Regions:
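Short aromatic-glycine-(Arg/Gly/Cys) micro-motifs in beta-strand/loop hairpins
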Residues: 1-19, 75-96
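A short linear-motif detector with a strong N-terminal bias
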Residues: 3-6, 31-35, 59-66, 79-83
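Extended intrinsically disordered, low-complexity coil regions enriched in Ser, Thr, Gly, Ala
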Residues: 16-52, 93-132
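Short, mixed-charge low-complexity intrinsically disordered segments
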Residues: 42-79, 121-148
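Weak global preference for isoleucine
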Residues: 7-9, 23, 35, 65, ...
Length: 148
């Protein structure tokens, strides 16, 4: 059975002073089946990367998530999945903090509204250093697999 995985990859590319991270989404039967795709996803790592965290995405915002084939019929009112990476700051801390989330919504603007309602967005800022959305991507089910 195919599953949708959300994976936090860590790596310290050559010439960098700190470990860096990125999020990878993949569809496979098991996490280890995604290793070749993860390696090609971040070629600058030159194969020297690790998994810092992962989850099988089975439910988002009360919606059950199921991977189906591209040719399967999906209802027209089906919501899409959006990955949002929020960034914010705390007074007297030399760091940009992040909060990653997956939102089920009919459109991108609705997903962004949901992100702006989180405690992170509302409280991780101070004058001159506002919370913001670093990245906002739709997990485009048409380009991967339809998800219901």
């Amino acid at each position: 059975m195919q599953k949708l995985f959300m994976i936090l990859i860590g790596c310290k590319p050559k010439g960098r002073h700190t470990e860096q991270h990125d999020i990878f989404f993949g569809v496979a039967a098991q996490l280890r089946d995604l290793i070749p795709e993860m390696l090609s996803f971040w070629p600058e790592a030159e194969g020297d990367m690790h998994v810092d965290g992962w989850r099988e995405v089975t439910q988002v915002d009360g919606q059950d998530i199921k991977v189906v084939g591209r040719t399967d019929v999906v209802p027209a009112n089906q919501k899409a999945l959006f990955f949002i990476n929020l960034g914010g700051y705390k007074k007297d801390e030399f760091e940009e903090f992040h909060y990653k989330m997956v939102v089920a919504a009919a459109e991108k603007s609705t997903a962004i509204k949901a992100a702006k309602q989180t405690a992170f967005f509302k409280h991780t800022h101070f004058d001159g250093a506002n919370s913001h959305i670093d990245d906002e991507y739709g997990v485009d089910v048409d380009d991967l697999y339809r998800i219901e």
